[in-house]
């Protein structure tokens, strides 16, 4: 067919005289509004967090967890209440990211979706509440003695747990320690990647960073001697373990340590020491959740609220002791039972095979009421498979001879860096009409941005 026009249009001329936004809306970068709220209840706790375009964690066949050697696409620091609001510019093709932080009391890593309005939001309290509501509908009601446990273990009065291992006798309020204690615990259990003489990467953990804790150069005891009567709580901090471990305690006269496991009464504190945001499967706990321990009086055969002077508290961990949903349900054990798993580990070294040190206990000198305890469940000896702290109701109730918790010289760095790399491709006839092959000049680049954190 033939149509008529008032005048012939010069489409080439129109494009040259139009703003490029009118006909060229292609963009390789998107601006995303970022709102992060870790919902910390105490002030003065700032955390550094990263955003990745892939899961930054890898899991090996032996169950160990390690950080991938990759750069984040964004990095920032929260305010003193764990909040951050800002804008990040990232590649336009990214629709999902991973929020990651190695600071204690943060859920990490988490897969998040950028919404249609290019916003990325995270509220840790809401996230944890949603996780618990999802798991609650899948578990049975909790009744006394519903779950079985090994004959070596004993249960506190009125204690029980659900199918995820969440105890029923948790204290009603979260007990997160002061910010400086959290920074110090993170610092001492940190992992640092360094290059050896051959150029190969090597991960340094507490075993290498503090050899004096392990080589006998100082008096190291992981058991907790009580020198003044006090109530004692065990508070969950974090776990980097792939295993589902059970943690408990025992007591003995300080001047008469046990010679074998048959000499102690193992009492369950936390059936499953996995965080609720555990990547593999479902966990049970969040940082600051607390169990009040009780002293078993052998003479009266009763539990008491206070631990007397002259007794020592020891720790035991049942490796892979909690029967989780990921474990095959074809055998006689039910989900939520305490099973033999990979066997027991003790803080009293002579109870372990080859006298192996399985825990590290470090006293916070400033408070006089806090001791950080790290457990090693397997073979990497980072002592971060279950991290707790002990809180006593009385100051200076614990033997001051315990090694001191090292202080973090730089809890939050004054500056932090993030590196970007990529390829720039140029068209030499732009914006004129050309072949648009974008290969007239190609440049690979790496840039590092430094920001003030404070």
Predicted region positions:
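Bacterial signal peptide processing site
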Residues: 2-8
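Extracellular distal adhesion/interaction modules in secreted or cell-surface proteins
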Residues: 8-454
